[in-house]
Structures are given as C-alpha cells and as structure tokens.
C-alpha cells in the first residue's frame, strides 16, 4: 500500500500506471487473512499446531477465490490452471479434515471429489474438441470447491447472495441502458467469489463475537 502511494500508482521499473483495483485486492486479501487468523484463534503459541495448518489452508483458499474473481472480472473466464490449484488445495483440505475433524464424513467428501474429477475431465475433453473452455462446467467445479471449504450452508448462502447481486446489477443495467440492447453476460464466477468472501467473513466474524 505504501509503495503504491510513494510511487504514485506506477510501476517502479517501467513507470506504467497500475490500476487501483490491484491495490484494493491486496488490501482486501490482507484483511481476509487477519479475519481468518482471529476466527481460528491463531497466535504465536499455537501457530505450529493443527491451527497453523488450518490457517495455511485458509490462506490458500482465500488466494484461490481472489484469483478466480480477478480473472473472471477482466475476461469472464475461469482459468483452468486456477481451478486445478483449487482442486489441489481441496485435496489438502480433505487430508486435514480426515485427520482433525471428529464428525468427518468420508462418504460426502469422496462423492464431491469424484464429481469434481468427472467434471474436470469433461471440461478438459471439451477444450481439446472445441478449443474452448466450458464456463458452466467450470462454475460447477468452483461451487464444489466452495462447498469443500465452507460446507453446504456456506455454499447455499453464497449462491443465494450471488443471484441477488446479479439480479440487482441486471436491473440497474436495464435502467441505465433503457431503450438499448444490453446483452453482456455477467461474470458469474466473479460474483460467486465476492459473495463467498462476504459469507465467509460473516461466518468468521460471528465466531469471534463481532
């Protein structure tokens, strides 16, 4: 943040103007990391225990969500590499839950992993056949990864909030572009990511009594 301010919002080397959006994303990421630490109750005494592992996985998930949001907002695309990263951290979360969750339901997790794997293979096959990614399949995979980290209630709230945001945005666009055709497709993954971040923050704030 300070470097952005001191350099006048320009790259240190090429002097190209840097969009304030990236600085906002960095600030929001930092806030999310702090809220995560407070929600988990991590401190210097327990950072090397299972809480440290939980925090590390949470950080990796936050980065994943922000990557999805940033790319989809710019290009309306869910990058396959980012999805694979999300699946990888889901596998790590699976190992963590298996070892540390008392009410761990292995059947539920296995079903989600199998469905995610099938959808990933289907999406990869379509890319090879048409050279185009399937946005809808990628959205479903994204939702499954969300469910892996925020469970069913968090996923349901995320989807409801996403639909609400898209509806409000569409209504505003219709009012602004009254009498004109507006066919631009919304970046659904971006809104899912934003909604999930809001739901996720609310869950952790409730845990620390805010």
Residue spans of the language-model regions?
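A membrane-topology feature that recognizes alpha-helical transmembrane segments
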Residues: 1-210
């Amino acid at each position: 943040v300070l470097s952005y301010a001191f350099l006048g919002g320009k790259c240190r080397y090429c002097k190209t103007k840097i969009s304030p959006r990236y600085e906002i994303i960095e600030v929001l990421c930092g806030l999310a990391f702090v809220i995560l630490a407070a929600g988990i109750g991590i401190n210097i005494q327990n950072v090397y225990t299972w809480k440290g592992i939980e925090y590390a996985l949470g950080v990796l998930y936050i980065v994943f969500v922000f990557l999805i949001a940033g790319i989809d907002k710019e290009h309306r695309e869910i990058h396959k590499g980012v999805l694979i990263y999300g699946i990888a951290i889901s596998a790590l979360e699976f190992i963590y839950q298996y070892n540390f969750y008392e009410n761990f339901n292995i059947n539920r997790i296995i079903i989600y992993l199998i469905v995610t794997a099938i959808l990933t293979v289907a999406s990869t096959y379509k890319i090879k056949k048409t050279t185009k990614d399937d946005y809808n399949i990628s959205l479903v995979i994204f939702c499954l990864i969300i469910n892996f980290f925020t469970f069913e209630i968090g996923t349901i709230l995320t989807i409801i909030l996403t639909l609400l945001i898209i509806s409000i945005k569409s209504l505003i666009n219709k009012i602004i572009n009254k009498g004109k055709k507006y066919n631009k497709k919304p970046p659904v993954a971006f809104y899912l990511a934003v909604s999930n971040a809001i739901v996720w923050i609310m869950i952790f704030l409730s845990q620390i009594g805010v």
